[in-house]
A protein has these predicted regions:
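Membrane-proximal intracellular helices of multi-pass ion channels
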Residues: 1-446
């Protein structure tokens, strides 16, 4: 029997290990959040509410049914923060780190799984990369907490201020969007700090750094400002990230927040441009945005961050590959390329698959929630985009949704964090993936 179990474990794919790892942590987190000690009232939380919160934390989303500051006790907040940290850094990253510290040998299976988890190009040097990720993550989160501490200690007292600084630093870096400022007004996020420069700047930098990907950090570490030496993926990530911050910020500045004072207008526009790509904090009331503004945020939420990062969504590279592929068709070029490097056809197929999957799930989920809850379709689509993009922004309807809608959001959050292709490959065998080829025949499109 033991030999059979070991054999089954050996034949599990990397994708299955990653998916089951996330599921296991979500279930354990749900059980911990159901304990009476996890709430300020001392009462147990229902399994559905605990499951939703644990999924949102592990999948670094930030959608909540219960306000984090007013409902959960210090123990409950600690569990949520731990789940955020595990989900942000990755289940496999944590597991490899524990194995290294305990002196255990890291086998090829573990190295291959880690490669998939952080989107590394090769298995070689994966343990060294894991150690680099752990050290850099801890360092950045400590620096972020130290920079936030003067503001939060001033507003909430020393010890609570330290806790709030650490919580928000980790939540921002992991692109989670959970906050404790609901102690002022429940579900208000960071709206009370909309003109506070330190909070705005630190949170935005943490979001961007956490969302550009671990391999991009490696390029920064190895090559400093010599951008020409960066791998092509890092160059694409910097280009797309810059555009997705600058262009939406311009729109928000000129069309959505034109009636507020200049400095507040600058901070609010910039923050609302950065946060939709999977962070989940907000410094403005999103219900007051026009439908165009809300649709722009939906698009940003679906795009998400970059591969191998703490962020979710389709990923910046997916968008870049699809746009570049379309441009190559318009220009009648045979291949898609970036910075003098050709993109493999398999990558383009994967990008198209991911895009189609996200759009279909986003639309179907939104339509089901809209019909079930009898709410406007735009409001429901905003919620499903936030879930599948693992963002956490909401128009305020999350706590009032029914069980069916919550289950839909849970599934979307999980899929958005684990990744569509990961889930597909986890359910398919090698034999199915390597099917026989059929005769080719053209079909007219467009």
């Amino acid at each position: 029997m033991q030999q059979k179990n070991r054999s089954r474990h050996r034949h599990m794919t990397s994708f299955q290990v990653i998916s089951l790892g996330f599921l296991s942590v979500i279930l354990l987190g749900s059980l911990l959040l159901m304990l009476p000690i996890a709430t300020k009232s001392g009462q147990s939380t229902s399994f559905s509410d605990a499951l939703f919160t644990a999924t949102s934390a592990v999948c670094v989303t930030g959608l909540v049914i219960k306000d984090t500051a007013t409902y959960w006790s210090l123990f409950g907040q600690g569990v949520i923060l731990l789940l955020i940290q595990i989900g942000g850094m990755g289940i496999i990253t944590i597991a490899i780190a524990i194995a290294v510290v305990s002196g255990r040998k890291i086998g090829l299976m573990q190295r291959s799984t880690m490669q998939e988890a952080i989107s590394a190009p090769t298995v070689g040097g994966i343990v060294r990369r894991t150690q680099f990720i752990i050290r850099t993550t801890i360092l950045i989160e400590i620096i972020g907490a130290a920079l936030l501490a003067p503001v939060f200690c001033r507003d909430f007292g020393f010890w609570k201020g330290i806790w709030y600084s650490l919580f928000h630093s980790i939540s921002a870096f992991c692109n989670a969007g959970f906050d404790l400022i609901g102690i002022r007004t429940p579900f208000s996020s960071l709206t009370s700090y909309s003109v506070q420069p330190i909070v705005n700047l630190v949170i935005m930098v943490l979001i961007v750094v956490g969302g550009i990907g671990f391999l991009t950090w490696e390029d920064i570490k190895n090559h400093k400002w010599h951008l020409k030496k960066y791998r092509m993926q890092s160059k694409v990530i910097f280009m797309v990230t810059g555009l997705l911050i600058f262009l939406p910020a311009l729109y928000f500045f000129y069309f959505e927040f034109s009636n507020v004072p200049l400095m507040e207008r600058v901070w609010v526009s910039l923050f609302q441009s950065v946060t939709p790509r999977t962070a989940g904090f907000n410094t403005a009331d999103l219900t007051l945005l026009s439908e165009v503004g809300q649709m722009l945020i939906i698009i940003l939420m679906l795009i998400g961050g970059s591969p191998g990062s703490t962020a979710g969504g389709m990923k910046t590279t997916t968008l870049a590959v699809l746009v570049s592929s379309a441009l190559s068709v318009f220009r009648k070029k045979e291949h898609t390329h970036f910075f003098g490097r050709r993109i493999p056809d398999d990558t383009i197929k994967n990008a198209a698959t991911i895009f189609l999957m996200y759009i279909v799930l986003f639309l179907v989920g939104g339509m089901v929630i809209s019909s079930t809850e009898d709410i406007p379709l735009m409001t429901a689509l905003f919620e499903t985009a936030s879930a599948i993009g693992t963002v956490g922004l909401s128009l305020g309807i999350t706590p009032d949704l029914g069980l069916v809608s919550h289950i839909i959001l849970i599934c979307l959050m999980f899929l958005g964090r684990v990744g569509g292709l990961t889930l597909i490959f986890a359910t398919l065998s090698e034999k199915k993936l390597n099917g026989s080829k059929y005769p080719q025949e053209k079909i007219t499109v467009g």
